[in-house]
Amino acid sequence: MDLRALIGVIEIPDLKKFLPEFILLLLAFILFTLELFIKGKERRLVLNVVSYVGYFSVLMSLLIPWMYKGDTFYGNFTNDPLAVTVKIFAVLITLAILPFASSYFSAKKSFYGEFYYILAFTLLGVFVLASTYNLIILYVALELVSVGFYILTALLRGSTEAKEGAFKYLILGGLSIALASYGAAFMYIYSGSLDLREILTYQGKDIHYLVLGLVFFLIGLAVKIGAVPFHYWVPDAYQGAPTPVTALMASVGKLAFFIPLVRVMPLVQEKFSLVWTITVGVIAALTMLYGNLVALVQKDVKRLLAYSSIAHSGYIMAGAAVAKVIGMKAVIYFLVAYAVMSAGAFLVLALMEKNPEWQNYMENFYGLRFNAPYIAFAFFVYMVALLGVPPTVGFVGKALVFMALSFDKLWWLAFIMILSAAISTGYYIRLVVVMYMHEREKEIRSAPSHLGEKFSLFALTLASVLLGVLPSLVWFLIKQSAENLFTG
């Protein structure tokens, strides 16, 4: 064969569209090499500095205008507005978490250099997951993110809780990947394609293969996002993991694992609109109610926030039940909102846990405003935001979901959402009350926080309020992301 003719039919990928991913991959290998060869006290400093430089470089590359345009790699990799929005917020939240991770492990009198390069590889998986419709690439990205979280959950080697949480996460996470792969196989049998867009628009006769494949695929995703009844790994993994890792899983992890579900939404409205609404709506209702009811009886605040995370998966799924533009706008906004709120809430716990006397039990929060006033205020903001009190970002998120449900006349699901939010008042307000209206039972002061931690906490607290007062700051990205998916 004429080599020139062969080259003529080969599409050369537009490599500049992979720039953020290339930077992340390079960062991961640099951190891996540095961790191997640099010893002594300077290792922590070098890994931190290189990480900050790398993530800021990734962020800058995402702000270049051409990142928003078109597909590449034979249509298997897309840099549409949704992908870029997810990547920007994933990097920003990772940068907010990074200062806490270093000081947290230092306070535990241990240093895990592998945290830095595993974090970079995990974020690379998030980026790829946000940018593909191809089932094989989706599988690889899901595995990359999942394996990263399995390892990070078990990072505290001396902790039995960490090992137990990581083991449960590994077993159920492996099951979810298997189910999603099984579903992908059925979808391929139906359509002969690995592209979700082609699969769900294909007019084939054996539609039962498509239905079966879609069911298995969605069950696999439901495990990842912690939806009921596939949520069993969430409380133990969140409680056992190092708290900065928990913040990462609750924010960036949830943001990433919801993206395949978001990309499927416009594709199901023609063939499966009613079935989709009922199925996703029922799972959302169960998830909202269960998460909030079980959170009511928790004494450990970290575990309470884990059940709150389950409940918020339900709120987001309620928006996803409306497979229309208005539903997608609500879902994307709520994902961003929850990422900000949950990261902040867990990072407050990470800050308190630096004190060896601190335990995350409710009684230790009594009179926290006396011991750590600015930390108590930040935690207060996150609690009212998670509850959905105006003018916080959580209120806007829940209002958008309620509007989407009302638009689609899903009054039964809207009622369950309001009921669930009312139930959640019990534990969010209880935390606020014990911090501000009870005297301290014993003096447990927070460990000193450095400038990076203070800035991150300030930024997340400000964002929790500012994005509620001025949602227009991010609305352009969210509106463009949703409308682009429905109009192509």
From Swiss-Prot:
Keyword annotations from UniProtKB, A to Z: Cell inner membrane, Cell membrane, Membrane, NAD, Quinone, Translocase, Transmembrane, Transmembrane helix, Transport, Ubiquinone
EC number: 7.1.1.-
Subcellular location: Cell inner membrane
Superkingdom: Bacteria
Protein's GO biological process: ATP synthesis coupled electron transport
Catalyzed chemical reaction(s): a quinone + NADH + 5 H(+)(in) = a quinol + NAD(+) + 4 H(+)(out)
Membrane topology: Multi-pass membrane protein
GO CC, any one term: plasma membrane
Transmembrane segments: 18-38, 45-65, 81-101, 110-130, 135-155, 169-189, 210-230, 242-262, 274-294, 308-328, 331-351, 375-395, 412-434, 458-478
GO function terms (MF aspect): NADH dehydrogenase (ubiquinone) activity; NADH:ubiquinone reductase (non-electrogenic) activity; quinone binding
Protein purpose: NDH-1 shuttles electrons from NADH, via FMN and iron-sulfur (Fe-S) centers, to quinones in the respiratory chain. The immediate electron acceptor for the enzyme in this species is believed to be ubiquinone. Couples the redox reaction to proton translocation (for every two electrons transferred, four hydrogen ions are translocated across the cytoplasmic membrane), and thus conserves the redox energy in a proton gradient.
Subunit structure: NDH-1 is composed of 14 different subunits. Subunits NuoA, H, J, K, L, M, N constitute the membrane sector of the complex.
Family listed: Belongs to the complex I subunit 2 family.
HAMAP family: NDH1_NuoN_1 (MF_00445)
Record-given protein name: NADH-quinone oxidoreductase subunit N 2
Organism: Aquifex aeolicus (strain VF5)
Organism phylogeny: Bacteria, Pseudomonadati, Aquificota, Aquificia, Aquificales
Gene name as annotated: nuoN2
